[in-house]
Amino acid sequence: MELIFLGTSAGVPTRTRNVTAILLNLQHPTQSGLWLFDCGEGTQHQLLHTAFNPGKLDKIFISHLHGDHLFGLPGLLCSRSMSGIVQPLTIYGPQGIREFVETALRISGSWTDYPLEIVEIGAGEIFDDGLRKVTAYPLEHPLECYGYRIEEHDKPGALNAQALKAAGVPPGPLFQALKAGKTIMLEDGRQINGADYLAAPVPGKALAIFGDTGPCDAALDLAKGVDVMVHEATLDITMEAKANSRGHSSTRQAATLAREAGVGKLIITHVSSRYDDKGCQHLLRECRSIFPATELANDFTVFNV
């Protein structure tokens, strides 16, 4: 999986940072696709500066209904339709997301020429396609807000083709059945169990993408053991009380959570517009003093999961 940050500013855009949007490139050999997490104003324009086609976008996950995470959605939906894209699209989000989308389209005389499904979610598992699952966790914010945990299912281990050939199993369709863990029967009556010729399963990757939040009970479960955790660092340590009073987190709180959850990497985003480039490096240093494996997301930064 690959993360592409389209917007990394909190609340309002700046000259160098747009408001929140994160693209997830699934990069799966049998199922390509793009997922979008939040869609602040101007997201479709940010997408034009990447190599990705909106036609590949098939799922959008909205954390909450504040404008800096949402106001780009109607324009993206309409432009996708005007471009002749017919691939279905599913939007997941909190209560009210359906009313927002339908109202915006209705009063502007707009529509989509592709199937559009809107799923209003609660806490818990919201999606599983057999390759990966997505679970929503409630966060601490003035509006109903969720973070999303994306977990790939474990992949089957490699098939020991050399051992199978030595056992007299001809390559071809039988290998495919054995790779799926099935038992086959050879012409001489012998039974071959695929599980005996498979290496250990390859653990799937796990990713946690937080919406806006102050410290909360669900945060540790959302982030526990993930390879990559994306979390806001809206304000620095000196402004922690102000951040919390508005349902946001400081650098220290993001980094401490990453350490306690045992994540592989922390990526901080959603930084206040009060910070210029020098100020953002200050935020990064504060996080790294607690959790060294921290990176700062800028617009169009790409990270592998």
UniProtKB/Swiss-Prot annotation:
EC top class named in words = hydrolase
Q: Where does Zn(2+) 2 bind?
A: D68, H69, D212, H270
Q: Give the enzyme's EC designation.
A: 3.1.-.-
**Domain of life assignment:** Bacteria
Needs which cofactor? Zn(2+)
* Catalytic residues identified in the record: D68 (proton acceptor)
- Supply the SUPFAM superfamilies for this chain: Metallo-hydrolase/oxidoreductase
Which keywords does UniProt give here? Answer: Endonuclease, Exonuclease, Hydrolase, Metal-binding, Nuclease, tRNA processing, Zinc
| One Pfam family, short name | Lactamase_B_2
Cofactor comment: Binds 2 Zn(2+) ions.
Q: Does the keyword Protease apply?
A: no
Residue positions binding Zn(2+) 1 = H64, H66, H141, D212
Classification via HAMAP family:
RNase_Z_BN
Protein purpose = Zinc phosphodiesterase, which has both exoribonuclease and endoribonuclease activities.
Write out the similarity annotation. Answer: Belongs to the RNase Z family. RNase BN subfamily.
Put simply, this protein is called Ribonuclease BN
Q: Which organism is it from?
A: Escherichia coli O7:K1 (strain IAI39 / ExPEC)
